[in-house]
Amino acid sequence: MAVARHGYRPWGSILGLLGLALAAAAAWDVASLRCTFGSFCECDFWPDLPGLECDLAQHLAGQHLAKALVVKSLKAFVQDPAPSKPLVLSLHGWTGTGKSYVSSLLAQHLFRDGLRSPHVHHFSPIIHFPHPSRTEQYKKELKSWVQGNLTACGRSLFLFDEMDKLPPGLMEVLQPFLGPSWVVYGTNYRKAIFIFISNAGGEQINQVALEAWRSHRDREEISLQEVEPVISRAVMDNPQHGFWRSGIMEEHLLDAVVPFLPLQRHHVRHCVLNELAQLGLEPSEEVVQAVLDSTTYFPEVEQLFSSNGCKTVASRLTFFL
C-alpha cells in the first residue's frame, strides 16, 4: 500500500509500526532534555501562533470565517495543558479557496519541520485508499497507523484530504480517537489534531455568498450560523462523503466546521500579487490583468466568483510572464 507522506513507510506492517515507535521513543529521550525548558515542546511540536496569524492575514484572501475559526480553535487547544479531546477541524469549500493552503500553514507553524515532520501524516484517497473493495483492509491499517503514531507521539497531526472520495465506512475507525475518552487502545490521544478537507458543502456556501451579494450585504457580514447548517446537511446527505454513517458528525465530534467562501476577482488579484512576490518579481498590472481576464467566473450572468479560486494562478502566471 502507498505511504502517508514523502518517502515510503511500512504503515501496513506491524514490524514497521513497532520500529517507528521504538525510533520515536529513542528520539524522545533526547528531545525531552531540551523540551523541559519549554511549555509546549513535545516531539517536534513548536507552535508559532503569532506567525500563523500573520501568514493568514497576509496571504489568505477573502476568508474571514476560516481565519477566525482556525486561530480561535488552535489558541484554545494549544494553550490547554490537558485538553479534554483532540482538536478536530473539518474544512469545507469550493476548489482553490485555500483549504489545502491553510492545512499546510498549520503544519508549518505547529511543527518545527512542517509537512516534513514525522509527526505530520497526510492522507489522500487516490494514493492511500484507491480501491473501495479493500476498505476493510484499509480500516485495519489506518487504525494501526493512527494508534502506533499516537503511541510514539501524542502531539501528532493527521490530515485527510478529499474526504468526498474516501471509501464509505473507512472513517468509522477514527471515531474512538476523536472523542473525550481518556485512553483508546492503551493510547492517550487527547493532544492530537485531526484535519478533514473536502469540497462538500461548497455549492451551498457559494449560494449563501451569492445571495448575500445580491442583497447588497458585505461579505464579512456572512456568519457561521448561516453556512454551518447547510454544510452539515450537504455532508450528511452525501453517501460518497467520508463522514457518511461514520458517527463522527452524529456524535458531534467536530470542534469546528470551517467554511471557505468563493473568491471574487479582487481576491484572485491578491493571489496573483502574492505569487509574484514569492517569485521575487515586481508586480506588473499588465500581467495581473492578463491572469484575471483568463480566469473563468460564475454564475453565468453575474460573473462574480472564480471557478477555480486561486488554484490555477501559479500555472497561469508562467504563461503570461
Curated annotation (Swiss-Prot):
Q: Which Pfam families match?
A: TOR1A_C (PF21376), Torsin (PF06309)
Give the record's glycosylation annotations as residue positions. Answer: 149
Q: Name the source's superkingdom.
A: Eukaryota
Q: How is it modified after translation?
A: N-glycosylated.
**Principal subcellular localization:** endoplasmic reticulum
Q: List the molecular function annotations (GO) for this entry.
A: ATP binding; ATP hydrolysis activity; identical protein binding
Q: Which GO BP annotation is one of this protein's? A: chaperone cofactor-dependent protein refolding
Which cellular component terms (GO) are annotated to the entry? endoplasmic reticulum lumen
What keywords are assigned to this protein?
Answer: ATP-binding, Endoplasmic reticulum, Glycoprotein, Nucleotide-binding, Signal
| Record carries keyword Glycoprotein | yes
What happens after mutating residue 162 to Q? Localizes in the nuclear envelope
> Does Glycoprotein appear among the keywords?
yes
Positions binding ATP in this chain are 93-100
Tell me where in or outside the cell this protein is found.
Endoplasmic reticulum lumen
- What tissues harbor this protein? Expressed at similar levels in liver, muscle and brain (at protein level).
Signal sequence interval, chain numbering: 1-26
Similarity-based family:
Belongs to the ClpA/ClpB family. Torsin subfamily.
Subunit structure, interactors included:
Homohexamer. Interacts with TOR1AIP1.
What is the protein name given in its UniProt record? Torsin-2A
